[in-house]
Amino acid sequence: MTNTPKRPPAGLPDKQTLLAFLRDAGSAEKTDIARHFGLKGGDRRALREMIRELEAEGALGKRGRKGFSPSGALPPVGVADVVERDVDGEMYVRLVEASADAPRALLMPDNSGRTGPAPGMGDRLLVKFSRGAEGWEARLVKKLDSERNRVLGVIRKSNREVRVEPVDRRSKDVLLVPHAQAEGLKDGDLVLAAIEKGEQRYGPKRGKILETIGREDDPRAASLIAIHSHGVPTGFSEQVEQEAEDQELPSLKGREDLRDIPLITIDPADARDHDDAVYAQKDEDPKNPGGWIVWVAIADVAAYVRPNTSLDREARDKGNSTYFPDRVEPMLPERLSNGLCSLKEGENRATMAVRMVFDKDGRKIGHKFMRGLMRSHAKLSYEQAQAAIDGAPDETTGPIMEAILYPLWNAYHTMLKGRLKRSPLQIESAERRIRMTPEGGIGSIEKRVSLEAHRLIEEMMIQANVCAAETLEQKKTPLLYRVHDAPSQEKLFNLGDFLGTIGKPWTKGEPATTKRFNKLLDETRETEHAEVVNEVVLRTQMQAIYSAENVGHFGLNLDRYAHFTSPIRRYSDLIVHRGLIRALGLGKDGLTDREIAELPSIAEHVVMTERRSMAAERDAMDRYIAAFLEDRVGATFGGRITGVTRFGLFIRLDETGADGLVPVSSLGSEYFTHDDRSHALVGERSGLRWTLG
């Protein structure tokens, strides 16, 4: 608990008293609540029933494994970041270090008469929170960041002046820079500039050029803009590069020799690094008839990136690799990411491997981790492996059909039985891929096709990740979990309201389960509502995060889960590898006591870096798609509504996946009201409805 409110007289509180206590306390577990109100015996049972009712009503939400707090509650005063600005210019803030489902708040106009620059995107503020008619509102108390001091922009030259115009068109920070600073720069150069501090309050701000990034008309500018706009770390220091160059392949000493096991890699056709390799064989144990042994071998990054080295500090800072259509900003230097750590065909590589045993019903009945030395027997793309299984093997896949590919697929189909019983969430997502030309232009935008080969690798990786979490728990070694909380009651109530508008029953008081969601998706899959229901169910889910505390993984329907299978590109996985090394006594390069103490802060950091990368990747994708459509202005496209707000409709084009806004002012002369319950804009005179989907 964050505070300790004054203790009331003993006795069961009413619902409002309980909610008031939780608002003051921040959050509390059932035992804390019972102790505070002096409850015993039957009163404790009544308290549990009251909490269940408040959850069903959407008034209470879970916090962690056992805690409860009022749904969507914000403190009276807090530190918040400006995280969003809508097309109307209204800005929204979110509480710093808030939970994933914490509400944002509308930043209200400052009528205090204070001087100085107004808050902008990225600023950190001290604000007062309050409930408004349409949600949470925030009022500025104090700016904690004196000003935004950097602008990514384009040089615009004239005889009179040199300007830096921000690439973010919503920004008003046009800078004037001295001609002397702009010598050698050309009109259209992309630059990073600093806002000069001073007392200037009117007219363009003064700026100083920090770095020249590229050209506005370079086809690859979209990625450069995204990298710098979102602060994605680039490159490596000389010390880190040298440390990577000094690494050598470990010897077989202290490792299992796995080189004769015909492990293969199956990856995207353009993959440069190969984290994982797989192999399956029938289990010959007479006690496990119809069972399978599945091997998953992962690059042993921990053998090269040791705790508190320059390599380690750089990898932690980056948190993960970031992927753009034309480039990758890797977490590790190329010597490792595309060299010693990558499981290349025919080359000896250090590995952390897990041998898993499944019974005929797809239930995992045993596993064992080991450090080894392996040699990949084939490098396949997903399309290549799928074509072989579908009856069109090539010169690479033909010779390995009987010994490798058929056993892999047969093992996968057995594992599917266990997956079906588990019933993970089956939400469809329409990912798109940009194919670049050799010159760096955009060749095409394609929808990713989901193949059985993708699902095979996904399921084998999921099971290996489960093994990692189970082993670390069994050995009582702290770890970074990958957690995904169940949807909040508030989101479930909103889902129920929406489903009621399309005639689909949804009992609001029932607990959310993946089976229940999957049943809903199956029932609407062949109907006109399929896409919109899929979209709304997706939005109902919480974001998966990393945590030192386990709350399970709702989407996968797993009690415990960790990321183990991608240590080349995710720091979280490297931490899990080190945990296994420590827990199983597999070397001296395992998780340190200091890292164990820092697990909560590491979790928080890698959640931030993951979201930073996702935002940058989306930004670059949007810019590439916009560039692709530049010469098609005025053309007609098919699309669907993916968002409905009071100020307009968000549309996604079917062909390219481009997202755009149709302002409410362009829908006609009549007044449209926003029906939040049914996700619709409704014309007051005509009754015309623009709805999600």
Enumerate the language-model features and the residues they cover:
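Charge-lined substrate channels and their catalytic hotspots, especially those that engage the 3′ end
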Residues: 1-295, 302-347, 379, 384-389, ...
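Electropositive polyanion-binding surfaces
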Residues: 192, 198, 215, 225-232, ...
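Generic low-polarity alpha-helical segments
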Residues: 500, 692-693
